[in-house]
Amino acid sequence: MNRPFSGLNRTECVSLMKHYPLSIGILAGQWLRLGEYQQDLRALEQPVLHLDLMDGHFCPQFTVGPWAIAQLPQQMIKDVHLMVDNPWPVVQASVKAGAHCVTLQVENTPHLHHMLHWLGEQNAEVSGGTMPVLRGISLCPATPLEHILPIIEDVEIVQILAVNPGYGSKLSRSALLRRAAQVVALLNAAGKRDAILLAVDGSLNLEELPEIIASGVDRVVSGSALFRNDALADNISRWLTTIHSAK
């Protein structure tokens, strides 16, 4: 499913990524059913899998390490979000394990500029060849959006968190929509709107999806809501229908 990304440059990869508005939080599923999930995703033409790597320090939860990236089907796009206190070795290990997108938290990434430049020199294997590793930054709910500006030339993904990592506190719908609109305005002012994919992550539900997409968001990250009631294919279909109707 990731063959179309082979041989594309960064701008072309971002443009193609925007055709896939869902990044599916695979850790919300059952690891032993990956083969079954892959069949559903292939039928729905949804190649993007999201993995949250948490170390129990930046946020109180532990999840998985970079080893898990290599266990995912080769045909999928691995969208990796690092929430760790010492990101540099995890960044390197994630790329080595096959990550196609690596998103860093701006709040706890020393030498962020250096890491983004290093990522900008990396490629990831896809069916039929390679693609550039796409670089992302993620912002917690209270992080000023101005943190985007110093590295806006060095990223392809900007991700807004609707929740505080590892905690249940979530932005109100109005606050989330306002924040998304502010990022869109910031990207437009910098002439980077087309070159950057805007994502939202964090306990999203189907009811708020139309307004989120209408605000200018390109991709939503969802895990538990898509795996709810053991109905992955049906849930994804409903989300995609809602997303396409809102555009």
At which residue positions do the language-model features occur?
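N-terminal active-site wall of soluble small-molecule enzyme domains
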Residues: H50-E125
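Alpha/beta catalytic cores of nucleotide-metabolism and tRNA/nucleoside-modifying enzymes
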Residues: N2-N9, A185-V200, N205-K247
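Catalytic cores of alpha/beta
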Residues: E36-L41, N86-K96, A142-V155, S203-S222
